[in-house]
Amino acid sequence: INNNFYPEFDGITLRKNLAVFYNNKYNMNFDEENFIIGYGASGLLSLIGEVFLCCGDELVTSQLTFESYEISAKRNGAHYVEVPTKENLQINLDGILDAITKKTKMIIICNPNNPTGMILKEEEIKNFIMKVPENVIIVVDEAYFEFIDIPNYKSMMQMIGNYPNVIVIRTFSKVYGLAGARVGYAIMNKEISVNLIKGVEFASSLSALEGAIAALNDVEFIKKTKEVIKEGREYLSKEFKKLGFKVFPTQTNFIYVDTKLDTKFIAEKLKEKGILIRGDLLLSRITVGTMKQNKRLVSAIKDIISNEVL
């Protein structure tokens, strides 16, 4: 890679590769104009917000979901509307439909959801999309889609042809292991991409774009990664249940856990043992690591619980 040159500002080569990849995988009819490359999924969320949201608009989404949605809304002066989840923490699609008003410009559905890891039934999302007014942009965040372990479960890319208000977001940060490269992409109707592409200055760095192209077709790496994550997910779920924790069903590379303990205290003790957990999510959302890392985490938690009064 000759980094003496600037990258393609719109990532056209990667976009062409993505079109071929999904046409072959899902029997779609995409071309490069159906794709936009961005600085990670978060960068794309910012871009989409800048184009479609303004002061007084509403962005409707679920409670207990990815924090960047709220940032995107408030950055553009839009009102952020959170719809409570169902009792089992699943996204309440009917509730989101009920929350739509004349001011609603955008809806975001994270599937699988972050931080819960839970997934919606394919038919539920399809029916939901059909009921949303056509003037409302529907963003389906599928950042963790590749981890789904359900045979024949289809992406909402399938809806783009008939529903031009649908945008699907994907990323190379998760299953492809390129979080530091910051390469995300959005799939959409060409009518929408024409407006979004105007906001792209440089999609990403030259090295990141080339790395994404190489990773896209690395079938063996993806297969191995999914196997490692599935094994680690099952191990952590089993061990946490033994400790009396409530473990929510997940289709991602992390698990959502209700410990019913003083999570801030445990996080501090884990930090003393060289194990860091993000912010105030603490023991709620735990990313699956290597088996060595997973066992070290479980051992540390057991040690803390047995030696401290919580």
Where are these regions (language model features)?
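PLP-dependent aminotransferase class I/II
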Residues: 165-240, 245-248
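PLP-dependent enzyme catalytic core of the Aspartate aminotransferase-like
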Residues: 123, 264, 268-310
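Conserved PLP-binding catalytic core of the aspartate aminotransferase-like
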Residues: 234, 239-273, 288
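N-terminal small-domain helix-loop-helix segment of the aminotransferase-like
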Residues: 1-42, 47, 308-310
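PLP-dependent aminotransferase-like
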Residues: 51-109
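Active-site pre-lysine segment of PLP-dependent enzymes
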Residues: 74, 91-102, 115-138, 142-173
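Short Gly/Ser/Thr- and Asp/Glu-enriched loop/turn motifs at secondary-structure junctions
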Residues: 32, 248-254, 279-283
